[in-house]
Amino acid sequence: MSKLSRLSFMMFLEFFIWGAWLPLIFGYLPSLGFSPSEQAWILNAFPIAAIVGMFFSNQFADRNFSAEKFLAVSHIIGGAAILGCGFVDTFWPFFVLMLVHCLLYVPTISITNSIAFSHIDDPKKNFPIIRTGGTLGWITAAIPFTFILVDWESVNAADTNGFIAWLGTVLDSGLTGDAMKDATRWTYVAAGVASFVLAAFSLFLPHTPPNKVEIGTNRSQAWLESAKLLRHPFIAVLFIVTFADSFVHNCYFNWTGRFLGASVEDGGVGIASNWIMPVMTVGQVAEILTMLVLGVVLKKLGWRWTMVIGVMGHAARFAAYAFFPEYQSLIILIQVLHGVCYAFFFATVYIFVDAYFPKDARSSAQGLFNLMILGLGALAANSICPFLFDKVYTNNGVIDFQGLFTVPLVCASVAAISLALFFKPPEVSVESAIDDDTV
């Protein structure tokens, strides 16, 4: 296996793990009887780990261990933890196992990037290919559950004639109730097994030694210098909008699965439970295609309008959720906007930071925006979304999906308008753009 193939397969497994359990956890936790506050604690294990990672664990791992060995150990322990989540149904064991998994998994996201960048000669050419392996891993994680989450008793009772008729029945016979809850446990088993496979495979990755800190290097000073850059209005605006967009992005994950699976009579889309994960992966397929045209779009539209389109993609999707849930084909098709939202905003933010921040502050600046994207924005959404769903927009068991989706719709619209009106970066894309105090 070539080096590029090994690095791509590393990314495939890395994101298969995350993609296996994330889409269905938001409906699984309520099915276990967890309260909104308990759901919030479990869901916030990931952003808490992201925040800890940005300030401590990522740097600790990067400086003290060879990357491939850290990856192996993290996925052995983290894999056991996520595997255990499939066999517990009380709050404290589930929360502790999820927290252990996330504390070990989150640093591996940056570690896999470090391994990849350390062993490719042309990052601009090769890294997108390697990273696409991660997107394919996320998509692939959904495929087995199209069949695992099938109500096979109903399929057998249907007594269909011919393979095509049988397959149609299979694909339209999703599990419900306790049967769905029990089958969802397999998402954690799949994530755990993939973790063990990646742990073993890590030993065959190219050796990546720890990064030694040069004498006189002050990491906290670099963070402080990056934070000082928020005094520039265009960076402050982008920072705030990034928080809002991350909040909206995580509303999508919190609510979409349950919305897709709810019956039409209850205001949902009525998609069979075994199709929820595949439908949500439409966005990942679109992400691959959107990333291919991102460079062209940036040249044509520039930073501001590319990002505005990315944020407005959320608004358009949630508008469809709120006002056209009865159009199942539209709801499925509009999942492509997930890829547009990711590429045109999050990916563009990373590129923007690389273009505008001074070289000695870029790494910390990326971390600063990651704090919003993976940390604080997700933390806010995971804290608020379960409460809004269960306590504010559910009355006597009836969910007001229109009111629920109006929240991220308004939030995304305000963020996009703010970006359009107040985000005015300098015309130049070099370090002097923010070194100059007159900016």
Q: Residue ranges of each PLM-predicted region?
A:
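Juxtamembrane intracellular "pre-TM" segments in multi-pass secondary transporters
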Residues: M1, T176, L205-V241, E265-G268, ...
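Multi-pass alpha-helical transporter architecture, strongest
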Residues: C85-G86, A194-P206, L404-V439
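Helix-to-loop junctions at the C-terminal end of transmembrane segments
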Residues: V52-S66, L149-V150, L289-W303, F389-D390
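Helix-loop boundary and gating motifs at the non-cytosolic
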Residues: M1-P47, F234-T242, S246-D266, W275-V279, ...
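A membrane-interface helix-boundary motif in multi-pass transporters
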Residues: V150-V193, F387-A412
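Structural signature of the two symmetry-related core transmembrane helices
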Residues: K69-G84, W305-A320
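Flexible cytoplasmic inter-helical loops of multi-pass small-molecule transporters
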Residues: A157-G168, L203-L224, V428-D436
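Hydrophobic core of transmembrane alpha-helices in multi-pass small-molecule transporters
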Residues: F12, A81-C85, F91-I111, I115, ...
